Design a protein with these regions (language model features):
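Activation corresponds to long, low-complexity, non-globular regions
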Residues: 1-13, 166-180
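Extended carbohydrate-recognition surfaces in non-catalytic/accessory domains of CAZymes
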Residues: 1-53
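Extracellular and analogous surface-interaction loops
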Residues: 45-58, 123-129
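Beta-strand elements of well-folded, non-transmembrane domains
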Residues: 47-53, 63-67, 140-142, 161
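A short beta-strand element within beta-rich, extracytoplasmic domains
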Residues: 53-77
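Short, solvent-exposed aromatic-acidic interface loops
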Residues: 65, 100-103, 174-179
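Beta-strand-rich ligand-recognition modules
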Residues: 73, 78-155
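Short, solvent-exposed loop/turn motifs
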Residues: 93-94, 165-167
Length: 180
């Protein structure tokens, strides 16, 4: 499959799941979506979500999953990560939450805040009745940065109930707008 933008063709492939690694931090030992990922590239991910009604849902959104075994710094306020990842639903950009960890000195003795999506309230998103477009821009520079030692080129996106307790019933995820 391919995607054409401004007269140039780009290769595509399907990925199934709520969390996708484009490149795993352990490199070739744990394969990601890209067979031979290279630094200084940008990937794009999209899907359509069919909603049987207009509704407010929660979403788990994440572009870097943190662990305290590393001395990684939390993202800067107003940014999802240090890679400049971005996400839009129905052409409206979804901004990151206010990060509770704001330290700028590396230490693995500082507890994680709400950096990981499952440790915070889901991000509210409005779905229209019918098809809703989800689009993500996923740039990556180097796979090791001063802020984050093990850069995780990945994304998580899934709709959940506003309280985050379960999946939203009746939704269909389809990059081809197919009700299956």
């Amino acid at each position: 499959a391919q995607y054409t933008y401004e007269g140039k063709n780009y290769g595509t492939h399907d990925a199934i799941g709520a969390g996708i690694y484009l490149r795993h931090v352990w490199g070739p030992q744990v394969p990601g979506a890209y067979k031979d990922p290279q630094p200084n590239h940008t990937a794009y991910a999209w899907t359509w979500i069919y909603s049987p009604k207009a509704q407010e849902v929660g979403t788990w959104i994440e572009f870097q999953n943190y662990s305290r075994s590393e001395m990684d710094l939390p993202p800067m306020q107003g940014k999802w990560d240090y890679k400049e990842s971005r996400i839009w639903v129905n052409d409206q950009e979804i901004t990151p939450p206010v990060w509770t960890a704001t330290h700028r000195e590396k230490s693995n003795e500082i507890p994680l805040g709400n950096e990981n999506c499952v440790s915070r309230k889901p991000t509210p998103v409005h779905l229209e009745k019918g098809w809703n477009k989800v689009f993500m821009k996923l740039p990556v520079g180097t796979f090791n940065t001063p802020e984050v030692r093990l850069v995780k080129w990945m994304f998580t996106f899934v709709c959940v109930t506003p309280d985050g307790e379960k999946a939203v019933e009746g939704l269909v995820y389809s990059p081809d707008k197919q009700l299956k």
